[in-house]
A protein has these predicted regions:
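HotDog/MaoC-like acyl-thioester-processing domains
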Residues: 1-15, 90-139
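Short, intrinsically disordered, mixed-charge
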Residues: 33-36, 72-76, 124
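Hydrophobic beta-strand-centered segment that forms part of the acyl-chain substrate-binding groove
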Residues: 49-58, 62-103
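Catalytic strand-loop segment that frames the active site of acyl-thioester-processing enzymes
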Residues: 1-56, 138
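A generic structural signal for short beta-strands and their flanking turns/coil linkers
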Residues: 19, 27, 37, 79-83, ...
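A broadly tuned preference for mixed-charge, low-complexity surface segments
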Residues: 43, 66-72, 118-123
Length: 139
């Protein structure tokens, strides 16, 4: 992987985005197995209906994982200096998630040329599910 060029980047530039496949019950089961989070809110339709919730929904950390993937498709994991995520809405079964990011600041940190990014994971209707910020070192 070739890191983006710090000098060629400008505030406002977008990083390459991606769209997930629809979140399915299989996605949730596989994520539960990998993460160890088997909470019935994400897996048991009878449980959630008894709570007055129409259907199971995605783990919040699944969206964070997708935003991590957005970053590591752009820079090596070792270049990530900080990564913080806020969960803003529930991801429903069947939704495709669109992960996007843009440069909001160029800075020098601990002698490294870095960029600060704003990242968003939203459904196809534009409803943000997760918002994040990250700092990555480029030189």
């Amino acid at each position: 992987m070739t890191k983006p060029n710090y000098d060629a980047l400008n505030v406002g530039d977008a990083i390459p985005s991606f769209t997930t496949e629809p979140v399915s019950r299989l996605t949730l089961a596989l994520y539960a197995t990998g993460s160890g989070d088997h909470h019935p809110l994400h897996l048991d339709q009878d449980y959630v209906r008894a709570k007055g919730i129409p259907d199971v929904f995605a783990h919040g950390m699944l969206g964070m994982a997708y935003l991590g993937r957005l970053l590591t498709q752009w820079v090596p994991q070792a270049a990530i200096r900080s990564f913080g995520v806020r969960f803003t809405a529930i991801t429903q079964v069947g939704e495709r998630l669109v992960c996007t990011g843009k440069v909001v600041e160029k800075l020098e940190q601990a002698g490294e040329k870095c960029v600060r990014l704003e990242l968003t994971c939203a459904n196809e209707q534009g409803e943000a599910k997760h918002k994040a910020d990250a700092v990555v070192a480029l030189a």
